[in-house]
Regions:
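The substrate-binding groove and active-site-proximal loops of carbohydrate-active enzymes
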Residues: 3-14, 36-52, 108-128, 210-226, ...
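Polysaccharide-binding and catalytic clefts of secreted carbohydrate-active enzymes
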Residues: 92-272, 276-286
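A conserved amphipathic helix/loop scaffold
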Residues: 326, 468-717
Length: 717
């Protein structure tokens, strides 16, 4: 594990400060400095290259003993290219140049944003030359650590409000992709309910029905993945050294229906995947980290950007933001990442931004480069990693027995149904709520991609799987889950499971096919208990006081309740009036629970009304605890109150590393209990090397946490 920082992005900081600042960075213990190499700046003419500043940076960083993370930015093409090759520019869906481009954006103040359409031959050729020339120049540098081949996947699949470029090359690729997918135009016509004479007639229309919209989303993702493979191929050919890592990262927003990237498809050829983070809610941050870790598919992942100072609130005037990071938060966000298995955390940035709409934000130092309490906190973090390298170099997090299922096409449908019509996205709320609930009681949560589950089954280590939004089916998915349940897994389904078949057509009976066999229920009606009460969005499902749900009382829910007819042997668990809306079926050695209401969504809705804080006594937590017990799952460590924790293991030692997080704005006290200690063990605070006390069988330990702070505890000598 290591900590680094962004340092130079033209024009900040000024050259005369570099030697002083880089020495400062080395003295506080940071290991890696990020350098941006913007295309628009380093190639001012067709055969002109200006690398003097970058050369100097590499020299001074090497003198300071610092490694360099070099950021390639093909998203800012030089202005002479736009003037000479207008055919390479982005276009709207009518084929016209997008107004007011290229421009200087917040993150690319040198201009040239958003770059070129790399579906165009000339755009691709010019960008390849930029990458080859730049990479070849620095591949022999001893202190080159990694190339970031794509910053935050900008411009993603949307730029300036457009789904993708409307140039002839992109539209042609869209039509070729459809032909490869369908083979014959009549096959597409049958599915889309159209009457095209050929694939050449097919336009791109962003507001359309589910089936076409899913194809558009999957083409967008295919195109994004192809662009990533293209970039990686160019960079690796120019720098074949395997110790020079190729990395990339997504942007700092939370996952919602506007999050259009299927991260699992862009990580295949990277050495490390990462994410920025500019969220305040620790639980949202945790969800983004679990997302990033899971999408990395076992590869290293990084917290690639985290604010070192004042943040942004996405308002017009960023400098008015009141989101200034405390010293505690400066430690906590990287420690949150490390507690989710990250191998690196990179501050954005060492010096406050000096130019453009992102100024004067983000610095670990003040605007003059002087140290602050945040630089001291970053130094404490780096020093802890150095002092306890034997612990952190051997830290690992066992695969989680608890997972959420993610079906990208379901959330594409939700994007069309809700977000684009200004409605609350219920599937996203349900996913977020289940994640918040599980995280609050100490579970690590894996995210399983539905395509992986359909193709390869559920990993053996998963014992409890929740599908928060199963509105659309996928071939093989129900069969994979059914086999896993028969083998002893516990599965929780969402309302309207399989409401649409894999083609996007509504199923005549819900749930259909294998889903029906697995869950043992049939939808009889959709109920909307709050439809006539505009003052409330939450209703209650009464739980049947037997077995699994005995003593819990009721569960808050949102939006709708799915009434069921039950097959023989299926046990009712929850009701709304006379209608059964929640059931349990035993299948082989496992259990399948049909939840006909969005319980996770209500949990998330209520937590957001409490500034993100879950209620420790919420009935959903009681239900999840019982489901986990049936699945044979429990966290290694639990914490009381509003603290939540993540626990890792130290290879070959029997020691545990506990990351204890306080997401609240107040100082709190929590009691920690370790579930699997055979004897009493000492507990040490690794940040200050103090002995906190002893914990063991039947013996909990009281720990204090400052507001928004994290403590790192070593359990065991």
């Amino acid at each position: 594990m290591f900590v680094g920082t962004q340092y130079y992005r033209q024009p900040n900081p000024p050259l005369q400060d570099w030697e002083r600042d880089l020495d400062h960075i080395r003295r506080i213990g940071l290991k890696v400095v990020r350098l941006w190499i913007p295309w628009a700046y380093v190639q001012p003419g067709p055969d002109e290259w200006e690398f003097q500043a970058c050369d100097r940076f590499f020299d001074l960083a090497e003198q300071a003993g610092l490694k360099v993370l070099a950021q390639l930015t093909a998203e800012c093409a030089p202005y002479w290219i736009h003037a000479r090759y207008p055919e390479a520019a982005y276009r709207d869906l009518q084929g016209q140049l997008i107004p007011n481009t290229p421009f200087a954006s917040g993150y690319l103040t040198v201009g040239g944003h958003p770059g070129l359409c790399y579906d165009t031959p000339v755009g691709r050729q010019l960008a390849e030359r930029y990458m080859r020339v730049t990479v070849s120049r620095y591949t022999s540098r001893d202190n080159l650590y990694a190339w970031d081949v794509w910053n935050e996947l900008n411009p993603l699949t949307a730029m300036g409000g457009y789904e993708w470029c409307g140039c002839p090359y992109t539209i042609s690729r869209w039509r070729e992709w459809l032909e490869e997918r369908y083979g014959h135009i009549q096959s597409l016509n049958t599915l889309w309910q159209r009457n095209f004479g050929s694939f050449d007639e097919i336009p791109f229309i962003p507001r359309t029905h589910y089936t076409e919209r899913i194809d558009q989303a999957e083409f967008s993702q295919y195109r994004l993945s192809e662009w990533m493979r293209w970039r990686i191929g160019i960079v690796r050919a120019a720098d074949p050294k395997p110790d020079h890592l190729l990395v990339s990262h997504h942007n700092g927003s939370t996952y919602d229906v506007g999050y259009v990237t299927d991260d699992w498809q862009v990580t295949e050829n990277l050495d490390a995947w990462g994410t920025s983070i500019y969220l305040r809610d620790f639980y949202e941050v945790s969800r983004k980290f679990d997302w990033t870790r899971s999408a990395a598919r076992g590869k290293p992942w990084w917290l690639s950007e985290v604010s070192g100072g004042r943040g942004i609130d996405h308002s017009q005037y960023f400098y008015l933001s009141d989101d200034t990071k405390s010293a505690a938060e400066t430690r906590s966000y990287p420690l949150l990442a490390f507690s989710h298995g990250a191998q690196a955390s990179i501050y954005w940035q060492f010096r406050c931004e000096s130019f453009g709409e992102e100024s004067p934000n983000f610095g670990l130092t003040n605007q003059a480069g002087d140290p602050t309490d945040r630089t001291a906190a970053a130094s404490e973090l780096a020093a802890m990693l150095d002092r306890h390298a034997a612990v952190f170099d051997n830290l690992f997090f066992p695969p989680s027995p608890v997972a959420l299922l993610w079906e990208p096409r379901a959330f594409t449908m939700e994007r069309v149904s809700y977000w684009e019509r200004s409605r609350t996205p219920i599937g996203v709320l349900n996913l977020a709520g289940y994640h918040r609930a599980l995280t609050s009681v100490g579970h690590q949560v894996d995210i399983l991609h539905a395509a992986d589950v359909a193709d390869r089954g559920i990993p053996a280590h998963v014992r409890l799987l929740i599908n928060p939004y199963g509105v659309i089916d996928r071939p093989g998915l129900a069969e994979s889950i059914a086999r896993w349940v028969e083998g002893g897994g516990v599965f929780v389904a969402s309302p309207v499971t399989g409401q649409y078949d894999a083609r996007g057509y509504s199923s005549p009976r819900v749930p259909p096919g294998t889903w029906r066999s697995l869950l043992g229920v049939q939808q009889t009606e959709l109920l909307y208990p709050t439809s006539h009460t505009s003052e409330t969005e939450v209703f209650s499902v009464d739980l049947v006081p037997i077995g699994l749900t005995s003593g819990i009382g009721d569960l808050p829910a949102m939006r709708l309740a799915e009434a069921y007819a039950l097959d023989h042997g299926v046990q009712p668990l929850g009701v709304v009036g006379k209608d059964v809306v929640m059931t349990l079926r035993t299948a082989g050695d496992g259990k399948a629970i049909a939840c006909g209401a969005f319980f996770g969504a209500a949990f998330e809705f209520e937590a957001r009304q409490r500034n993100g804080m879950p209620s420790p006594s919420h009935s959903l937590l009681g239900l999840l605890d019982r489901l986990a017990a049936i699945a044979g799952v429990r966290p290694l460590v639990s914490a009381t109150g509003h603290a939540f924790c993540r626990t890792g293991c130290v290879k070959g030692s029997g020691q545990l590393v506990l990351f204890l997080h306080n997401p609240t704005e107040s100082e709190i006290t929590t009691w920690i209990t370790v579930s699997e200690l055979g004897a009493e063990q000492s507990v040490f605070s690794l940040l200050d090397d103090s002995l906190l006390g002893v914990t063991g069988p039947g013996r909990s330990l009281c720990v204090g946490l400052l507001a928004r702070d994290t403590r790192v505890l070593l359990i065991g000598a």
